[in-house]
């Protein structure tokens, strides 16, 4: 449940997040497994997994939900091989090349034939709604994956007026300034990892790990018109993360000291531990995100 990534969206119009109402709405779009002819299924599952029955998990006004996507695995190479064999056989039988539409029909028939025997893969994506802060957070590795889940939530709720939380000032400008000067806003500290890109279209990319970021070597790259597009940071010794120029937060790691706070709860009591960990995570993110966006120069007006 602890988020590893954080795609942050902000609510840009007034909307009420009622946990009881959302519970009913999510149930209408509950995940069901793929049938023999389904390529994929996408729906909501219990936020607590096998440890709970409710679709939502709530602490104060904060709401956690979870989407599950199941996809049938049909390797393109397998489809292509089957298609080539069928096309070759039919062209030999009919003594003419098949038309494009005929090949497409054959391909669909092959997919229909393979689907019942295909393996499935599943993944879960958590969404955290923070009404007081006006944020919706998605634990996804890209905005594309986050948008897929938010599209399902929008369909579920009927309306979801959100936009990515992107600061007014270009993030790479701020990150470059932090590295160039070696100075960061209070509470934030540079770690030892960064990515720098040339401002030129065909320019190079430098990725460095375990590197002193204020060294002459790194500063020489900045002097040669490279900007910092990813930067590893620490916040108040409580969070470590990599911030990218699109304002996405990756490799989010909560401190051991924080995570150990609930060690007095017996491991066997999974539901109680989940609830306590959720409250801790919400508290940290609710303090961290406003602090981060303030350090980045602030977000534009919600209706801008």
Swiss-Prot record:
Pfam family, any one: RdgC
Top-rank taxon, per record: Bacteria
GO biological process terms on file: DNA recombination; regulation of DNA recombination
Primary location group: cytoplasm
The entry's keywords: Cytoplasm, DNA recombination
A GO-annotated cellular component: cytoplasm
Subcellular location: Cytoplasm, Nucleoid
UniProt GO molecular function: double-stranded DNA binding
Keyword GTP-binding: no
Family, per entry: Belongs to the RdgC family.
Matching HAMAP family: RdgC
Classification via PANTHER family: RECOMBINATION-ASSOCIATED PROTEIN RDGC (PTHR38103:SF1)
Role, per record: May be involved in recombination.
This protein's name: Recombination-associated protein RdgC
Organism listed in the record: Vibrio vulnificus (strain CMCP6)
Name of the gene this protein is made from: rdgC
